[in-house]
């Protein structure tokens, strides 16, 4: 059985780079409360948008898709799921909402993990959720020629319950002891969870839900307002590279958690930077929406895309953004560059 060492292993991760990243996140967390107190009304918009973005992104990473319109309707509970993909999207929304509302009272123990997995599949047919895998699984990768090969072989099905029990016991011991920064401890737990791969399906989505839960419990609630799942989706290749690098030698206890920990610290830093930027833009609510879009463009060095503008101004509709960009191009305020998905705009 794998030994989950959350006492000596974390000490190996205190490299100058990781220590600097952790220190920067602590600084952002210190500002977090000030932002939350000063911008209560504006933050409601960010929360609603992040809920939609997180639900969509985490499912898309696993190849589960629906249209933007249907996604918004499902997350807003204005529609019932029509197919299997939408059932899984609706289930993710349910678990994410539970974590947002009750994270203080949710402790990552085996029975809780099983209940969250059950709820993840609460809209799905059959008894998919709430039980550990009943057959061994393999994490595969496809090479350039289209051939699949095993990248990692997780814990066998018959050892899964014991592995999750031990994982949770050791993690909670380290959490309560508080000898290591939780920013380092949390990604270590998530990596071990993914290496166990306890379910037949839904392991990736469960890992991201547990990540949010644990960061919230540690006081880092930026994921409520900026979708960390979307940031992961945008850097999916780097995510899988870090996961693979940190899983080598996992069974023997010889793996390095450093690549995966650094990846997640980078995601957290990016989330806080975006959070502060979006709050800053929301402060311009006294301006008209076209003028707010101009402020966003003025503050951007180089090219900016329509999608980036909409992410920074989540309360402004797509139609308004498109109309404003068209008007600004016509007036000579900005120039349109590129075509298709790479279309952007630059200040003249």
Show which residues each predicted segment covers:
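FIC/Doc superfamily catalytic core
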Residues: 1-348
């Amino acid at each position: 059985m794998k030994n989950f060492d959350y006492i000596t292993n974390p000490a190996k991760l205190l490299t100058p780079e990781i220590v600097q990243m952790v220190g920067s996140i602590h600084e952002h967390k210190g500002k977090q409360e000030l932002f939350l107190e000063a911008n209560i009304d504006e933050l409601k918009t960010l929360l609603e948008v992040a809920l939609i973005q997180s639900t969509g992104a985490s499912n898309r990473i696993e190849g589960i898709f629906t249209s933007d319109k249907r996604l918004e309707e499902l997350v807003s509970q204005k529609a019932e799921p029509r197919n299997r993909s939408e059932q899984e999207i609706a289930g993710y929304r349910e678990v994410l909402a539970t974590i947002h509302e009750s994270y203080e009272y949710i402790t990552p123990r085996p029975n809780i993990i099983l209940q969250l997995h059950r709820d993840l599949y609460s809209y799905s047919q059959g008894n998919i959720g709430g039980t550990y895998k009943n057959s061994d699984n393999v994490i595969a990768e496809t090479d350039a020629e289209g051939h699949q090969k095993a990248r990692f072989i997780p814990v066998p099905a018959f050892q899964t319950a014991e592995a999750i029990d031990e994982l949770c016991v050791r993690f909670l011991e380290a959490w309560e002891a508080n000898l290591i920064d939780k920013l380092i401890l949390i990604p270590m737990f998530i990596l071990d969870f993914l290496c166990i791969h306890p379910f037949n399906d839904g392991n990736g989505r469960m890992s991201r839900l547990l990540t949010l839960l644990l960061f919230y419990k540690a006081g880092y609630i930026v994921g409520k307002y900026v979708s960390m799942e979307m940031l992961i989706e945008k850097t999916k290749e780097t995510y899988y590279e870090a996961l693979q690098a940190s899983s080598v030698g996992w069974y023997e206890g010889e793996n390095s958690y450093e690549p995966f920990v650094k990846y997640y610290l980078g995601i957290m830093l990016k989330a806080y930077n975006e959070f502060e930027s979006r709050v800053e833009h929301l402060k311009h609510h006294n301006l008209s929406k076209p003028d707010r879009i101009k402020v966003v463009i003025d503050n951007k060095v180089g090219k900016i895309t329509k999608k980036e503008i909409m992410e920074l101004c989540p309360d402004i509709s797509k139609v308004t953004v498109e109309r404003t960009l068209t008007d600004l191009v016509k007036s000579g305020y900005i120039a349109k560059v590129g075509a298709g998905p790479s279309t952007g705009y630059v200040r003249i």
